[in-house]
Amino acid sequence: MLDPTEKVIDSESMESKLTSVDAIEEHSSSSSNEAISNEKKSCAICGTSKTPLWRGGPAGPKSLCNACGIRNRKKRRTLISNRSEDKKKKSHNRNPKFGDSLKQRLMELGREVMMQRSTAENQRRNKLGEEEQAAVLLMALSYASSVYA
């Protein structure tokens, strides 16, 4: 069995060891705090050391003060948007002559189709009798009056 006096001695020795470890930790943390306080963080652009928020920049994370970080982000956004606008302009204006000639060809094709339709309609009218032509004419007139009314 264990002697109760031995337990007390063991717990006392453990307490003394713990207090010595705590003292060492306090000393090391205070020395690291002193090193941090001696090396004040400053903004990479303007050099200020007091800001409510540190922001990431070209020099790495938390290297810019709040104001410089916002300015830097806005500049990056405008550069990116300008690049995308330039790309859009270039894609639309690749060959303006090609677009004009394409429009002209489409207009000519439309005219040809209209001419073919009118000749086909004339042929149909010739095949229709007098009553059918009158019916088609009445339908066209009723449709035109409903459109323009």
Swiss-Prot record:
Asked if the Swiss-Prot or TrEMBL record annotates the protein with the keyword Cell membrane, the reply is no
Specify one Pfam family: GATA
> From start to end residue, where is composition biased (Basic and acidic residues)?
1-10
Q: Which InterPro entries does its entry note?
A: Znf_GATA, Znf_NHR/GATA
The protein in question is named: GATA transcription factor 15
Keyword annotations for this protein? DNA-binding, Metal-binding, Nucleus, Transcription, Transcription regulation, Zinc, Zinc-finger
Look up keyword S-adenosyl-L-methionine and say if it applies. no
The segments annotated as GATA-type zinc fingers are 37-91
**Which Gene Ontology cellular-component terms appear in the entry?**
nucleus
Species the sequence originates in: Arabidopsis thaliana
GO molecular function terms listed in the Swiss-Prot or TrEMBL record: DNA-binding transcription factor activity; transcription cis-regulatory region binding; zinc ion binding
User: Where does it localize?
Assistant: Nucleus
Physiological role: Transcriptional regulator that specifically binds 5'-GATA-3' or 5'-GAT-3' motifs within gene promoters.
* Region of interest (Disordered), residue spans: 1-41, 76-102
Q: Which PANTHER family match?
A: GATA TRANSCRIPTION FACTOR 15, OS01G0976800 PROTEIN
